[in-house]
Amino acid sequence: MSLPHLRRLEAEAIHVIREVVATFSNPVVLYSIGKDSSVLLHLAMKAFYPAKPPFPFLHVDTKWKFREMIEFRDRMARELGFDLLVHVNQDGVEQGIGPFTHGSNVHTHVMKTMGLRQALEKYGFDAALAGARRDEEKSRAKERIFSIRSAQHGWDPQRQRPEMWKTYNTRVGQGETMRVFPLSNWTEFDIWQYILREEIPIVPLYFAARRPVVKREGMLIMVDDDRMPIQPEEEVTEQLVRFRTLGCYPLTGAVESDAVTVPEILREMLTVRTSERQSRLIDTDEVGAMEKKKREGYF
């Protein structure tokens, strides 16, 4: 598959990754295990081949990820040999914080946002690369590739710096850090084309299969373990579904689909008119949800 635009996107992303290594003393990749993280992992491996990437990969584990995601994470770390760090907010675990008991907003803030902030401070990382893209969500659409964060890890859109002619300002003040998004200019379709071209392994949840789901708040939520309470009016049914995006399983909706290969997913996407993140409850639990979370230190 020869697609010139994919070569340009790949070159830009590798340039950004190398720029981070050249200008920061202690960078890390935020590895959330999804398709974008898989592409970012692949690009990082390419950027420094035959050497290993000169930075670790950090997964902030909320303890509510799909089981297949955790199995995939551990398998990739074994097979590729990259340095994997897993951080859990133990304060949240001790308090029993979860999506069912405390709601999506509190769960995400404590287990993801605060967990990430804890990990960045624990290891002293000054730059964190992540796989967010501008086409995913409106607050991400206005964020720069190099996104400066305050000493409290907050994002202020008014402090963003111009990025003209692929020239990046990587300087940070005392206590400040940088979030870096090498895939900013990619689209969901680009991601899948690149996965096809490069034969990148991804979590099987992206492919259609018969899975146990319940319909809740207009979404098909997969019953991944026995911690999920089933309401009296709800019925668990086996349906042919897949996921366009992955997160904590109680907060991530599946879509009805029969696409079981990457080419079939690409064909399916030609008819899709909604964002992949419309099936993420954390993006809709309040007005301006994603921007508010980013201002508090979210990815």
UniProtKB/Swiss-Prot annotation:
Entry keyword Transferase: yes
Keywords, in A-Z order: ATP-binding, Nodulation, Nucleotide-binding, Nucleotidyltransferase, Plasmid, Transferase
UniProt cross-references to CDD domains, sorted A to Z: Sulfate_adenylyltransferase_2
GO molecular function, one term: ATP binding
Pfam families, A to Z: PAPS_reduct
GO biological process terms held by the UniProt record: hydrogen sulfide biosynthetic process; sulfate assimilation
Reaction(s) catalysed (UniProt annotation): sulfate + ATP + H(+) = adenosine 5'-phosphosulfate + diphosphate
Superkingdom as given in the UniProt entry: Bacteria
InterPro entries per UniProt: PAPS_reduct_dom (IPR002500), Rossmann-like_a/b/a_fold (IPR014729), SO4_adenylTrfase_ssu (IPR011784), Sulfate_adenylyltrnsfr_sub2 (IPR050128)
Documented EC number(s): 2.7.7.4
Record text on subunit structure and interactions: Sulfate-activating enzymes, NodP and NodQ, may be physically associated.
Function noted in UniProt: Proposed to provide activated sulfate for transfer to nod factor.
PANTHER family listed in its UniProt record: SULFATE ADENYLYLTRANSFERASE SUBUNIT 2
Annotated family: Belongs to the PAPS reductase family. CysD subfamily.
Protein name: Sulfate adenylyltransferase subunit 2
Taxonomic lineage from the root: Bacteria, Pseudomonadati, Pseudomonadota, Alphaproteobacteria, Hyphomicrobiales
Gene: nodP
